[in-house]
Amino acid sequence: MCGCVHSTQDQALRLEGEPNPPAAPTSTLAPKNMPKSISISKQLASIKALRKGSDLEKAIATAALVFRNSSDPDGKLRKATAKNLLQTQFKNFAEGQETKARYKDLLSELDEHTENKLDFEDFMVLLLSVTIMSDLLQNIWSVKITQ
């Protein structure tokens, strides 16, 4: 896996190989000083390793960039921000879940999170949990995959 460094000259990302990638996403896809005004699609396009990346790789990279762009300088996401992201960036998956017990339990666990912040792993588990219980997932399963 590669880390990225922000180029102050042209506001682009360039990749540098790392023999031992960091365990925490401190330098995964976008550095802390990446201007928030740059769209996710432009940030993705600037990552050379993803130019020929698969749809799945780009999907995970997008989630990582959304997390990174929304996180505090310490690389953690406040729970209020996480809830806001569910409502604004993940609304089609979260829609209709508000009255379901599993969704309420998930948000309750988020409220009880002792640190009051989520790291990237916790954020991804949250997204996957909401996805699995989502009504939208049932629609996705019913999409024709052959002609």
Swiss-Prot record:
Name the predominant localization: other
Carries keyword Transport?
no
Q: Compositional bias (Polar residues) spans?
A: 25-34
On the tree of life, the source organism's domain of life is Eukaryota
Q: Where in the cell is it found?
A: Cell projection, Cilium
Among InterPro entries, the record links this protein to: EF-hand-dom_pair (IPR011992), EH_dom (IPR000261), S-100_dom (IPR034325), S100_Ca-bd_sub (IPR013787)
One Gene Ontology cellular component = cilium
Q: Which UniProt keywords apply?
A: Cell projection, Cilium
Q: Where is this region: Disordered?
A: 14-34
Q: Which Gene Ontology MF annotations are present?
A: calcium ion binding; calcium-dependent protein binding; transition metal ion binding
Protein task: May be a component of the linker structure that bridges the ciliary membrane and peripheral singlet microtubules.
Another remark in the UniProt entry says: 'Sentan' means 'tip' in Japanese.
Name the chain's protein: Sentan
- Native species: Bos taurus (Bovine)
Taxonomic lineage is: Eukaryota, Metazoa, Chordata, Craniata, Vertebrata
**Gene this chain is encoded by:** SNTN
